[in-house]
Amino acid sequence: AASDVYKRQQSWYRTLCILLIIILVASIGAMLVQTNFGKVRTMNISIVTDHQQQLNATLYIPQNASAENKVPLVITSSGWEDAGESWSYVATELSRRGIAVANMEPYSHGTSGMFYQKGEMALYTNMYSDGMGMVALTDYLTSGILDFIDTDKVGVTGLSMGGICTWTTVQHYGHMYNAAIEQAQSPDSDGGESITEDELLAAQSLLKVTAALPCGSPPTANNGYDPSALHVNVGCLMGSIEECGDLVSTKTSRIVGDAIEGIEFINSSLSDGEKVDYVEEGTYYGNREDNTLRIIYQPLSIHGAIPIVPEAVRDIISFFTYCFEVNTPVSPTSLIYPAKLLFNAIALLALLAALLPLMDLVLAMPVFQKLRAEKEPPKVPALTDKKESKKFWIGVIAGGCVSVVTAFITMPLYLKIFPDASCGTPTAWFNIAPMNLIVT
């Protein structure tokens, strides 16, 4: 009847209004947390880099940042097929501790342009040369164009692909430093084969990054790691239960203890008398003041969850606040970003729920009325009859059990079919192990 249709539409209107209010309130809540209740300003920036590429980033600027009160800066990069927003939680925590953050959208991600290289290995070429835009963004942000940035305290970090970009960026300036020192030692330089103070200062001025923390990217040659180009404080963060653990000698994600990669990474900056044969997780080695600091973090986290796992976020906070000597009353354990996660989840669920009343109201519009069924179709028997309902739920549970059992059965099969990919080696199939598992 017409009255029933009218009542249903009114009910949908009320439901939709309630859901829209929930979305609005949750979004405002997330925004307040992200800006530390108005104490942090966020803004989007866009720059043009070499080869006429566009690179975008979101800046998180603490309220107290000014030309008279310069603040440290951390530049972040997401992983492959991820969004710059994934690092917003880390940015929220660092910025409320007085550190400006630039959440970069790497080339071919978000609204940034594509990398200019062509061919099958274009992604890897760019990661190992341009850092997917991180080098260009670092050059821009440390050029002095932003008067509130302390260019003597600039850090870089990123996850997975972003971790490789972090290695690339910090080592890019390290190689420039090495070249300057080599030039200063040439016989035709100002001081001859001896390095003058001015030559040393000129070389040190090329080190635009002063602290680096690659995440989910162990210090191996495959990730572009070159210890000879590291002249600043560097850490490495790997989840203790990462899926990419087969990339290291332990064949697990463990790079502390007696892991070769961890020992070599720590010893790379230590003198012969200081070298170690066992690495403690979360322990500082070397010296912050002379830029020989090294540390390895192994929080309980899988690979992709590192930027949102509390233990990992605390480690990231601890590293940069320590390297930059940030005096803040906010401890690394005081985290507010989970509230933003909650608000985001509420807004998302409300948005999904709003699709039902919205679609019903749209179908009531004259232009879409022909798409609406003349009468409501009968319910599925399984939802009306108890006996059929029992069969239905038994089928659902049985189907789930079959999925679990077959997953365990296909894992060994997957390792046999894709032996190279299972240990992180690129193949003619897919170069990421989970993709091959889907095939099997």
Locate the predicted segments by residue.
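Short, small-residue-biased leader/transition segments that mark boundaries at the very start
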Residues: 1-6
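Context-gated lysine
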Residues: 7, 36-41, 70, 118, ...
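Core alpha-helical transmembrane segments of integral membrane proteins
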Residues: 334-440
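Soluble extramembrane regions of membrane proteins in the secretory/endomembrane system
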Residues: 42-336
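An N-terminal hydrophobic leader/cap segment in hydrolases
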Residues: 8-48, 56
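Generic preference for well-ordered secondary structure
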Residues: 29-31, 78, 196, 300, ...
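Membrane-embedded alpha-helical segments in integral membrane proteins
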Residues: 26, 30, 324-333, 406-412
